[in-house]
Amino acid sequence: MRPIFPFTSIVGQERMKRALVLNAVDPRIGGVLIRGERGTAKSTAARAMAALLPQIEVFVDSPFNDDPHSPNTWSDWVKEQVACGKQLEIRKQQIRFVDLPVSATEDRVVGTLDIEKAIQKGERHFEPGVLAAANRGLLYIDEVNLLDDHVVDILLDSAAMGVNIVEREGISFAHPARFILVGTMNPEEGDLRPQLLDRFALSVEIHGIRDARERVLIMQRNLSFESDPEGFRMEWMPPEQDLSRQIEQARTIVDEVTYTNRDLVSIASLTASLNVDGHRADLVILKTARAHAAFEGRYSINERDIALAAELSLPHRIRRSPFQQAEVTMEDLQERIEQLQGATASQSEPEQVQKQEGASEKKKQ
């Protein structure tokens, strides 16, 4: 196994690192597309993120990396084993980094059902694909713009639904497919269709660092890593462990992060004022804002969370706006949000929105 360059030692590219971290906190955000020239640490950052994440518990013989503590997400295979009274052993493993080749076919991605065996022996046999291996891990697609559009659609559907269902000749098989989706591409080699571009929750455009001092630092760290990979990794172990713990803690509280009606109005007003098509962006901003609040250890979102989420969620979704001439900044978005909130402040007082609406209604009664 080749040594992995530490995530926290990557110089600059803060937006890219932030987008990866927030997807690690909550994979339900829906992945990140990283666009940039060659040699800007795109694949390095993705591999480093997978290595950074804490170990997970899985069933020993399951090819689907099922979570032993989440029965409602178990694959059909685990359900069948449990129904037969089998005791499945549990072990810990490092989160998997799954690299999808550009030549991947639909069957290679989703897996295949053996129809002949089902007809002859009455047995349901499923050969797992890439989505099975990537469950609860990180799925990396280099040059995603060169991948078959239909395959990209399948991947994005699975990332959004969190489950892969394969159906052939009246036979079906389902397994969890919740993963951190990271796609990278060089825009010079062609872009994604707008329909597919919108399906990536977050998008970051990165460039080579122009500051001479930072370029020197990049050279120094890369040379140190090449000469002594293990020593370099040990040097960066403390910040790596700190970030890993912070992500793990954020994962435990992200579902408890609350938001107000005013926050929802701010998000909706922002996307409407920027002529964003559809409603996917609104939901992505909310999920990303909650993940950022959880990452900072807070239980409610604020204007900065929304602005930061919008900075990562909107640039690739806006067709006609100043964002096409100048790079969007979090400060610009936060200022716009404050203006929108000021315009709507007199209309209604913010009311706390709890995830458990039914429970909230009971409390009001």
Task: Label the model's feature ranges.
Residues 109, 182, 244, 339-345:
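Short flexible/disordered coil segments
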Residues 1-213:
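Conserved ASCE/P-loop NTPase catalytic core
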Residues 123, 129, 173, 234, ...:
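Short leucine-rich amphipathic alpha-helices used at interfaces
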Residues 151-152, 210-318:
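Basic, amphipathic alpha-helical bundle interface domains used for macromolecular binding and assembly
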Residues 41, 57-58, 66-70, 189-190, ...:
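Short, intrinsically disordered/low-complexity patches at protein termini
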Residues 44, 48-52, 62, 74, ...:
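Short alpha-helix boundary/capping motifs
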Residues 41, 268-280, 291-365:
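C-terminal engagement/docking regions of AAA+ P-loop ATPases
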Residues 63, 231-236, 323-324:
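Short, flexible loop/turn segments with low-complexity composition
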